[in-house]
Swiss-Prot record:
Pfam families: Beta-prop_RSE1_1st, Beta-prop_RSE1_2nd, CPSF_A
Family: Belongs to the CPSF1 family.
Molecular function GO labels: RNA binding
Annotated spans, Disordered: 810-843
Annotated organism of origin: Caenorhabditis briggsae
UniProt-listed InterPro entries: Beta-prop_RSE1/DDB1/CPSF1_1st (IPR018846), Cleavage/polyA-sp_fac_asu_C (IPR004871), RSE1/DDB1/CFT1/CPSF1 (IPR050358), WD40/YVTN_repeat-like_dom_sf (IPR015943)
Record keywords: mRNA processing, Nucleus, RNA-binding
Lineage: Eukaryota, Metazoa, Ecdysozoa, Nematoda, Chromadorea
Name of the featured protein: Probable cleavage and polyadenylation specificity factor subunit 1
Function according to Swiss-Prot or TrEMBL: CPSF plays a key role in pre-mRNA 3'-end formation, recognizing the AAUAAA signal sequence and interacting with poly(A)polymerase and other factors to bring about cleavage and poly(A) addition. This subunit is involved in the RNA recognition step of the polyadenylation reaction.
Length: 1454
């Protein structure tokens, strides 16, 4: 048994976040870093996102959003994160990450290549440091000094590693000190932070020298201590400078307070304490649960009646601290200072707003707070400080107080008047501030995935339903979130457009929607045929245009719009037609003997390419009338350049740049500044003309000097070339300041972002011509002068980084070309009589086709088209490169570079290699002598503002989302498409039109606005508002059964009196936090509106938990030899220690009833058929061969459902606690809480159940989920555990290590760094499979994929492999680590090996599972590296590509 594992979608939860300057460059601003399990993202705050008009307003509004600028995936889960400026990169922040068990990596974004660069690696994994431990290590913690002098990491909880950041050192050298060497009592460290304001780096430890538990609190409490340790990084010396003992025993975390206050805040579950070396401590207690269990002096705030366990906090400013609780509430902790403002005298704690359940809090730009969550959506909040006037505050206080309490006689005022007035002023200051929060943006999270199921495809158009389709079409529904963030998530792997109308157009090849009406809807639909063109007028219906406005007697090559849609342009084989307002304005005949094969239309230019590779350029002129004017290419520098390289052009396209990235370098290599540099949203350095105001004066007077004295400094001499421009900029700056512009920017987060305001850069849009040559070179020319500004050599190699060719490289390439031409002539003369000449010629032509760039376009994607992406088709693959600003030494050229994105789109459906082992012919052959464009950029389709549709056999949508960068979504459900165009109409707002390849059907469609296509897995999230535990789809009723719960505080305890349980109510005071056991309910959800079906709620008893819910097919008496499907539920009643644990088995069915008026979804009801209490806890359920298998504690029972009753057939004693069961035919997998997994076999003829085999590893971790891996006649068993391991077992009684079949044989074990709680099996996707023989296809179809969802929101699959593919990919996995450096320096074998590392006794070679995340890095290598690596493996690169592409497509469902 061999397998292939790959995570297809990255985690959506966020574990860590930080704010800093992570992207290199002078004008990049500050960014937000988020890490979720293994997925790292860097965001910028973009305040210029356009929001479409709503019902209230008719104009577009600007809003603030988080925009992903960089993302990457790690090999292993990150355990802790810190940020620092290291000496190697002083101009940007570096990221320090720790990994299991004691690894530390320092990484940063590389300026030249825009990838994650590893700066320093540190491994502290030593047998001596472990002190004999093999498991249960303390997680590694990393912290950095606020002054960037050093970093510290906790190693195995017993040692501290120090990393000094010496300024003149080229390397970061670390050293380790045992904690016991600092102080013998320093042990059991809970947290540590660096303190600010000390001469030397000082670490504050929170530790517990003598541990205690809540059960021993009556004898030992106040056990927590802190210790401040000064670190001398030069002499490697430690000194204890501060100690405080007898802190409350519930303290668990520290928060360092910056200057001028200093000190630290200690957070506990029930207490908050502020500590400072110079002032007495102060603290508060939050409830009465702690009464009698601490002697630490605490201020009474028990009226809050809350706890802070699992909380997180962050320091904001001015003594304010944001605290997030586990209930999803955000609190404000205020450090109240004395009159001098330097010492803290008390704490104030209050609730400010509701948020997601926070796991991390980070203060971003001024006035912005990021809430990162693992259980709900992460949020970007804006907060503003509200001040209440003293009169209103005093009036409010007078209303609240009793008049008799505030009456003061004359003697009091005469004696204490000043003190009374000061006290009243202090009270006014305390009450006059409050924070108001508002949500700006949220990052969607679909984790944790607790349960998932398949469901009927929702939103499925009738035109897409095909009875002959073999592959299933389904939705994946998951139970996600927790508490108030609980939700149902509906996932659709492929795009399913909503078909509005469909019609047959025989002979149609391409289509375009052009021309705009006043309401922005399209006027015409141009349909190109083989020898003619059909023009359809768009209105309520599609009607053929009778007027002769367009050219109809020739096929159309391209069509588009100029003047923002006012002018429709049609390019045919021989001419160009301009149409506006129902009349043809101009018809330009192209001066060429060869027909036009390609064209690009971008306002105000039209570029065409003829069949002989000659480019022609036209520009729209407005004087003396609107017409197209041809630009004489022969008079530009392009003609000279073409003669020098003497190549034929294969593609031309025009790019309109709105990102402000494409700027020419000046003579010294720097970027040229556009004319409106101060207007474009970048914070460009303005020449300083007015004098700087001293800091003290600025604090006192601010900018009042401008108002009082004007601008006398303006008369100072200026540089003549910039005087007018600079004065204009300064004048504009002054105007904005007077209008409060800075305050507006601060509230929107724009002052620390390099985002561009599109309203200011609209006038500075530049245009460029992208040209592809037949020798694999891509050049970029400026328009309209066609000057060469950038050239990419050897693009056919598809390197990871594209840079501008230097003059030396160009000369070298010319010489190599001349040498190759001479050698070719000699070989031609020698091989005139050789029989292999013809074969060599065929191979040479095939090689030329593989190196040919068929299409190349630069498309502006993302928010405000700020991310230019180079999309090219080469060797029947679509490759993507993202442009970024980079230093270019060549004057007059663009200061940009391109980095390859980890996305590869294959355009073939058949394998690259034939049966004879040779390269198969190209599928992208020219039809009728023409090759139509496959790259279709668009603006505004449904909720997607811009994107690209790739046509062909595998239609793919490209979206550059703000959530995580570039995402690809296939649309293969309707087969291959040969034409696509965006379409806007009164009936179909922001839709699209496409044409199928197979039947030439024209379909007008739109995308579902409810789904979020920014996500890697398109999803629709339905908020439920409570914890969702389980979800199951009932096919017969087309309904979803959902088990959920809400916490319900309880003061009851059950005791046994005379063999009966009785309730005892324990009265507690009103400030006591009562335990809140969950109250479970069962609901039916309809897929019509994704809401609970009215009047179907089934409530369970108090203290009763639902442990399992399954749809079980059981043998039915009503059907001869048939099965009826029922909904089965298992429950456990846990009333405490004294009452025996019982449980129930409930069998019910969903029946159809008459719906209530106005409630169409109320046509379903739950009918309970069986409901009885069992003699033990019912912990698992499944159906096995028409019978019901149930786990009850340490036993397994099998039942037959007959006469609405369960009749016991057989039982089996297991180990400790069986809590999950999975079955297939007559075998089942039983998971035990301590004894891993067992294989159960049921023999129906003997009514006997037995353990066939089990996993008896002593080092086995606690299991979480299991599933079968089906490979035709063979079957394997998958197991996930709490350490993130996935283990593959097989039943091999003939193997000696299986001990005659008693042991399950371990075939593979891998650690993916995330916990898996849900598996599903599904047939492989075979629609795009082009196998060589029916036998091979049958074998492939019998292999099933096992899908998994993790608690971090990621998804993946495991698929069986043939031995031939396994050996090929296994060798690839072994060698690929030497070619591709891994992020953070993680070693492939070390990072992905099972944890904890233990010898495996029941398996010989536990490496039979291929790591798809590693081997798929091969797809993103350059062609040279691919060929070299394949040669080392002894195969061709196309063989490996075929294996990987087939595995990808087998897992890409409808």
């Amino acid at each position: 048994m061999y397998g292939y594992l790959r995570e297809t979608d990255d985690s959506t939860a966020i574990n860590y976040s930080a704010y800093g300057k992570f992207l290199p460059g002078e004008n990049t601003g500050f960014q937000l870093l988020t890490i979720g399990a293994k997925f790292l993202r860097i965001f910028r705050v973009n305040p210029y996102v356009l929001k479409e008009p709503g019902e209230d307003n008719e104009e577009w509004q600007q809003k603030t959003k988080l925009e992903c600028m960089f993302s990457c995936r790690l090999l292993n889960k990150c355990q802790s994160v810190a940020v620092a400026r290291v000496p190697q990169l002083p101009d940007q922040d570096s990221i320090l990450m720790t990994f299991d068990d004691a690894k530390l990596s320092i990484v940063a974004v590389n300026e030249k290549e825009r990838n994650m660069q590893t700066i320093s690696l540190h491994a502290f994994e030593n047998e001596y440091l472990r002190d004999g431990f093999t498991t249960y290590f303390n997680p590694p913690i990393v912290r950095t000094d606020p002054a960037n002098r050093c970093a510290a990491s906790l190693v195995y909880g017993k040692h501290i590693a120090i990393l000094p950041f010496h300024e003149n050192s080229k390397r970061i050298l670390s050293y380790i000190i045992p904690l016991k060497q600092i102080d013998p009592r320093l042990d059991n460290v809970a947290d540590m932070v660096f303190l600010e304001g000390y001469y030397e780096p000082t670490i504050l430890f929170l530790y517990e020298p003598l541990q205690t538990t809540p059960g021993r609190a009556c004898v030992r409490y106040d056990t927590m201590c802190i210790m401040g340790v000064s670190v001398n990084i030069v002499d490697r010396q430690f000194a204890v400078v501060w100690q405080t003992a007898n802190l409350p025993m519930d303290c668990n975390s520290l928060l360092s307070i910056p200057k001028p206050l200093g000190g630290a805040v200690v957070f506990g579950s029930n207490t908050i304490v502020y500590l400072n070396q110079a002032v007495p401590p102060c603290g508060i207690v939050l409830n009465s649960c702690y009464d009698g269990f601490t002697k630490f002096p605490l201020k009474d705030m028990k009226h809050l009646k809350m706890t802070l366990d699992c909380s997180t906090s962050v320091y904001m400013e001015d003594g304010r601290i944001a605290v997030g609780s586990r209930e999803g509430d955000l609190y404000l902790l205020r450090l109240v200072t004395s009159s001098g403002g330097a010492t803290v005298k008390s704490l104030e704690f209050s609730k400010v707003c509701d948020t997601s359940i926070a796991f991390t809090l980070t203060v971003c730009a001024p006035g912005h707070l990021f809430v990162g969550s693992r259980l709900g959506d992460s949020q970007l909040l804006e907060y503003t400080l509200l001040k209440v006037t003293k009169e209103s505050a005093k009036k409010q206080r007078l209303e609240q107080q009793n008049p008799s309490e505030i009456e003061l006689d004359e003697d009091d005022i005469e004696l204490y008047g000043g003190a009374i007035e000061m006290q009243q002023n202090d009270d006014d200051e305390q009450i006059s501030e409050s924070l108001q929060f508002r949500e700006l943006d949220r990052l969607l999270n679909v984790g944790p995935v607790k349960s998932m199921c398949f469901g009927r495809p929702n939103y499925m158009s009738n035109d897409l339903i095909d009875a002959k389709r073999k592959d299933p079409v389904f939705d994946l529904v998951t139970a996600s979130g927790h508490g108030k963030n609980g939700a149902l998530c509906v996932h659709q792997r492929s795009m399913r457009p909503e078909i509005i109308t469909s019609s047959l157009l025989e002979g149609a090849e391409q289509l375009w929607a052009v021309g705009r009406k006043e309401n922005e809807s399209h006027k015409y639909l141009i349909v190109s045929r083989v020898r003619s063109t059909l023009i359809l007028e768009l209105g309520e219906e599609l009607v053929e245009l009778e007027e002769q406005l367009f050219v109809t007697n020739e096929p159309t090559v391209a069509a588009g719009e100029l003047l923002q849609g006012a002018l429709a342009v049609q390019v045919t084989s021989t001419c160009i037609a301009l149409v506006t307002d129902g009349q043809q304005m101009q018809e330009v005949h192209i001066d060429s003997n060869f027909p036009v094969v390609q064209a690009s239309i971008v306002d105000p230019y039209v570029a065409v390419l003829t069949q002989n590779g000659r480019p022609l350029l036209y520009e729209l002129a407005m004087e003396p009338y609107v017409h197209l004017r041809e630009v004489n290419v022969n008079e530009t520098s392009f003609a000279t350049f073409s003669e020098q390289i003497s190549t034929q052009l294969t593609s031309v396209s025009i790019y309109s740049d709105a990102s402000q990235i494409m700027k020419k370098n000046t003579v010294d290599g720097r970027d040229e500044k556009p004319e409106n540099a101060a207007e474009n949203g970048h914070h460009v350095a303005v020449p300083k003309i007015k004098k700087e105001i001293p800091d003290d004066d600025a604090m006192l007077y601010g900018e009042d000097d401008d108002f009082l004295y004007g601008d006398a400094e303006e008369d100072e001499p200026m540089v003549a070339a910039e005087s007018g421009e600079s004065s204009t900029r300064l004048q504009n700056t002054r105007k904005r300041k007077r209008l409060g512009h800075d305050a507006i920017m601060s509230s929107r987060g724009g002052e620390q972002s390099d985002a561009i305001d599109p309203t200011r850069t609209y006038s500075s849009i530049t245009h460029w011509l992208v040209v592809a040559h037949d020798n694999g070179r891509i050049t970029i020319h400026s328009l309209p002068d066609l000057e060469l500004v950038y050239q990419i050599g050897r693009f056919s190699n598809v390197p990871e980084l594209l840079v501008d060719m230097t003059v030396e490289e160009e000369e070298k390439e010319k010489k190599a070309k001349q040498t190759a031409a001479q050698e070719k002539e000699k070989e031609t003369e020698k091989k005139k009589d050789d029989a292999k000449n013809e074969e060599d010629q065929v191979n040479s032509e095939m090689k030329k086709l593989c190196e040919k760039v068929v299409e190349a376009q630069i498309v502006g994607m993302g928010i405000n088209q700020a991310h230019p992406v180079l999309i090219a088709i080469i060797d029947e693959e679509v490759v993507l490169y993202e442009m970024f600003a980079s230093y270019n030494p060549q004057p007059g050229h663009l200061g940009v570079a391109f980095r390859k994105l980890p996305h590869l789109i294959g355009l073939r459906t058949s394998p690259y290699v034939n049966i004879d082992g040779k390269r198969a012919p190209f599928e992208m052959e020219m039809e009728h002598g023409k090759r139509y464009t496959l790259i279709h950029p668009f603006e505004r389709i449904s909720s997607i503002n811009n994107g690209v549709m790739i046509g062909g056999a595998v239609p793919t949508l490209l979206v550059y989302g703000a959530w995580g960068g570039m995402q690809t979504h296939q649309m293969t459900i309707d087969g291959s498409i040969k034409a696509f165009t965006p379409f806007n109409n009164e009936n179909v707002l922001h839709g699209f039109v496409y044409m199928t390849q197979q039947k030439s059907e024209l379909r007008i469609a739109r995308m579902h606005p409810d789904f979020d296509y920014d996500m890697p897995y398109p999803v629709k999230k339905i908020e439920v508002g409570k914890t969702v535990h389980n979800v199951r789809y009932l096919m017969n009723s087309d309904i979803y059964a959902v088990v959920s719960s809400v916490p319900k505080p309880s003061n009851k305890i059950w005791v046994v009196m005379n063999d009966d349980k009785q309730e005892e109510i324990h009265e507690k005071d009103e400030n006591f936090v009562l335990p809140a056991p969950p109250k479970y309910t069962l609901n039916l959800f309809s897929s019509q509106d994704w809401a609970a079906v009215p009047n179907t709620e089934f409530e369970f008893e108090d203290m009763e938990a639902v442990t399992a819910m399954e749809d079980v097919p059981l043998k039915s008496e009503s059907r001869y030899g048939g099965l009826d499907t029922y909904l089965a539920l298992a429950t456990v009643n846990n009333y405490g220690e004294e009452v025996l644990v019982r449980g129930r088995i409930i069998l019910c069915e969903v029946i159809e009833v008459v719906p209530e008026p106005g409630q169409p979804t109320s046509n379903r009801k739950i009918k309970v058929l069986y409901d009885k209490e069992q003699k033990g806890p019912v912990t698992g359920l499944c159906a096995i061969n028409g019978l019901l298998l149930s786990g009850m504690g340490q036993k397994v029972f099998i039942w037959q459902f007959k006469d609405n009753d369960l009749m016991g057939i057989s039982f089996l004693d297991m180990h400790y606690y069986v809590y999950q069961l999975h079955s297939i035919r007559t075998i089942a997998l039983a998971l035990d809480a301590r004894e891993s997994m067992s294989l159960i076999r049921f023999q129906e003829e003997n009514k006997a159940m037995s353990i066939a085999s089990r996993d008896d590893r002593k080092c086995a971790q606690a299991p979480m989920a299991s599933e079968f891996l089906v490979d035709g006649m063979h079957i394997g068993f998958l197991l996930s555990d709490e350490h993130g391991n996935i283990t593959l077992f097989s039943y091999s009684p003939e193997a000696p290590e299986s001990n005659g079949g008693e042991r399950l044989t371990v075939k593979a074990a891998i650690n993916i760094g995330t916990n898996i709680n849900a598996f599903l099996r599904v047939k492989g996707h075979t629609s795009l499979l082009d196998s060589s023989s029916p036998e091979e296809r049958e074998n492939i179809e019998q292999r099933m994929n096992t899908i998994f969802g993790s608690l971090d929101g990621s998804f993946g699959y495991i698929r069986p492999l043939t031995e031939k593919s396994y050996r090929r990919l296994h060798f690839l996995q072994t060698f690929i680590g030497s070619v591709t450096p891994q992020i953070a320096g993680l070693h492939i074998k070390g990072a992905r090996s099972s944890k904890p590392s233990q010898p495996i006794v029941n398996g010989r070679n536990a490496r039979n599972l291929i790591d798809g995340d590693v081997v798929e890095q091969y797809l993103h290598l350059s062609v040279y590296d691919k060929t070299d690596l394949a040669r080392r493996l002894g195969v061709g690169r196309y063989h490996i590509l075929d294996d990987l592409m087939q595995l990808r497509r087998m897992a890409y469902y409808y």
